Amino acid sequence: MAAISPWLSSPQSFSNPRVTITDSRRCSSISAAISVLDSSNEEQHRISSRDHVGMKRRDVMLQIASSVFFLPLAISPAFAETNASEAFRVYTDETNKFEISIPQDWQVGQAEPNGFKSITAFYPQETSTSNVSIAITGLGPDFTRMESFGKVEAFAETLVSGLDRSWQKPVGVTAKLIDSRASKGFYYIEYTLQNPGEARKHLYSAIGMATNGWYNRLYTVTGQFTDEESAEQSSKIQKTVKSFRFI
């Protein structure tokens, strides 16, 4: 009994092993819980960041899509440099730092931005639905190059599917992707749009990114013509869109 009594006579010796074990387990559980919470918070932050970027990406895509429906109405004349080259002349915008070759007899105008930084239109003198427009959109710091929107194939699919309303009842505009490719920092996308009962429109876009020294800007150059105008305008419009470059 004498051998046992020292262990029993000490409440500290009696209780500490159990308390130590319990506290150890409790601490381990708390540490694990904190670790899970930290991981959860980090994951929520990552998801929130992705959602934020995703929302801004969708906003930009909506602006790109809306630029497609621009029509050269109620515009004011704009100055164009006339460095003639055969049937084309070079239009230079020193403010927005770009130049583009347009058909010699086409008119130039500025439209109300309406959410854009700038919209410039080029179109024939005669009555026509053919035109080329350049819409400039401001971008946040998350977008530093075209790949920020994903690969060109996915970008094109998202853009065109966002325009398609053929699934609606009654049926809306039908949008079909024809081709997409990336070249020298630009995304080139070719597709068609057709409203019920109207002529099909062919659209050819060049989309690129540049900075003015303060923030990034997205330039969407879109040329369009109908099936009826295809033979006359197709080559002109594609040449015009492809000639766009930053200065």
Swiss-Prot record:
GO cellular component: chloroplast; chloroplast thylakoid lumen; chloroplast thylakoid membrane; extrinsic component of membrane; mitochondrion; photosystem II oxygen evolving complex; thylakoid; thylakoid lumen
Predominant location: plastid
Recorded superkingdom: Eukaryota
One GO term (biological process): photosynthesis
Keywords assigned: Chloroplast, Plastid, Thylakoid, Transit peptide
Keyword Coiled coil: no
Signal peptide: none
Transit peptide: 1-26, 27-80
Location relative to the cell: Plastid, Chloroplast thylakoid lumen
Keyword Transit peptide listed: yes
InterPro entries, per the entry: Mog1/PsbP_a/b/a-sand (IPR016123), PsbP_C (IPR002683)
Expression induction: Down-regulated by photosynthetic redox signals.
MF-aspect GO terms: calcium ion binding
Membership in a protein family: Belongs to the PsbP family.
Identification of the protein by name: PsbP domain-containing protein 3, chloroplastic
Organism listed in the record: Arabidopsis thaliana (Mouse-ear cress)
This protein's encoding gene: PPD3
